[in-house]
Amino acid sequence: MKKLSIVLLSVSMLSSIAFADNSDRVVATYTGGEVRESQIMKEFKPQLNLPSGETIKNFDDFPPQDQDKLIRIYVNNILLKKEVEKSNITSSKEFQEKLENAKNQLAQKELLENYVKSNLTDKMFDDEYNKYVTSLKGKEQIKVAHILVKSEKEANDLKNKLNKGADFAKLAGESSLDKASATNGGVIGYILLNQPGQLVPEFENKAFALKVNEVSTPVKTDYGWHIIKVLEKKPVPIPTKEEAKMTIDNVLAAEILKKYISDLEAKADLKIMLPPAANNEAKK
């Protein structure tokens, strides 16, 4: 079984300790208490994510290292809860203010999530999916690699070496300031043109103008100077509804909430008493 990804619950979310049946095996003891299998299962089963898709039914289904980890998390939460109770920290004014702020934020988050759920319809999803698919049809994605350096001179020197037959991946590993891609021969991965949140326009425009295996002249961006190489070009795959669900849900949620907040501001007759420049900057 693959190693489980265990979510450490915060002390504030610790549920009350369930009464355990005497037939449960005791898996740990501590001063003033003991831990039974059923308590671990009740506490953690809903929060466990198995990449393999397997279902956890019994405590013994967990690998030994995860059994130990779960027990320690469970007991540590109990011990810390007791320390909190002894400290009287929750009675301080500062804590009460933080608690009230946290409650307000949690309530607002719940409100917004519920609002999105009640206003995001199947038709909206289908319409947005169809629009998304249409926007991808006929588009091309490219696999790019780059070498990033500080100065134009460094970039030109690298370009000259490449023109003389130097290996791009080797130079990227030796010279690129982008350490994340340098360890992979400068490879960034696949990109689409004008896709929000990807790369800066100067980089994208130069990359999409290249042919496969062609290397660019030095390109300047806010990050420095780049030498770009296109490794592959292929059509953008059309995702299924399931594959696109998260992307589309996020887009629709943002639109729904933007309108909701705008309507609230309008109902409240909100007027910002700042100079126009500052007001316009805040809206960006």
From Swiss-Prot:
What start and end residues bound the annotated signal peptide?
1-20
Q: Which PROSITE patterns match?
A: PPIC_PPIASE_1, PPIC_PPIASE_2
Q: Which residues form a coiled coil?
A: none
Q: Please, which domain of life does this record's source organism belong to?
A: Bacteria
Q: Name one GO cellular component term.
A: cell outer membrane
Spell out the molecular function terms from Gene Ontology: peptidyl-prolyl cis-trans isomerase activity
Keywords from the UniProt entry? Cell outer membrane, Isomerase, Membrane, Rotamase, Signal
User: What is the E.C. number?
Assistant: 5.2.1.8
Q: What is its main location?
A: membrane
Cellular localisation? Cell outer membrane
The PpiC domain, residue ranges = 139-232
Which reaction equations make up its catalytic activity? [protein]-peptidylproline (omega=180) = [protein]-peptidylproline (omega=0)
Family matches, as PANTHER family: PEPTIDYL-PROLYL CIS-TRANS ISOMERASE HP_0175-RELATED (PTHR47245:SF2), PEPTIDYLPROLYL ISOMERASE (PTHR47245)
Q: What family name appears in the similarity comment?
A: Belongs to the PpiC/parvulin rotamase family.
Its protein name is Parvulin-like PPIase
Q: Which organism is it from?
A: Rickettsia bellii (strain RML369-C)
